[in-house]
Amino acid sequence: MGKLSETLALAQERARSLNLPYAGALTPREAWDVLQLAPGARLVDVRTRAEWDWVGRVPDAVEIEWMLYPGNEPNAHFLAQLKRQVDPEVLVMFLCRSGARSNSAANLAAASGYTNAYNILEGFEGDKDANGHRNKVGGWRHA
């Protein structure tokens, strides 16, 4: 079994153990490895435009807001935008700040026919540290 297969199997087992309805749950490091090893895999960043502009972007990511900024309203066109930009047959990974919005996006994608939908745990900024701040522990930025 190669590194890609091992990584996906681990993510799939993690999803089964957590009773998640999508294909798998990846750590940020695992997601990076998948992007390098899986031709055609896509990363969908579901943070807001403000987060992309002020916190940082992931190169080559598909950017679709889950919650619209300003106003923090749900993006009623999320699924239509996803279908326009990402083939339901490819492996797709969802990323947000902490892993919560991306979990919701992966749920919706899986329910809508994306059989290879994965959530990226910890998100872009990682978990909160002892002082309640992000960007110090884990996350995509530190993978």
Task: Give names to the regions the model predicted.
Residues 94-95:
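Short, surface-exposed ligand- or partner-binding patches at beta-edge/loop junctions that are enriched
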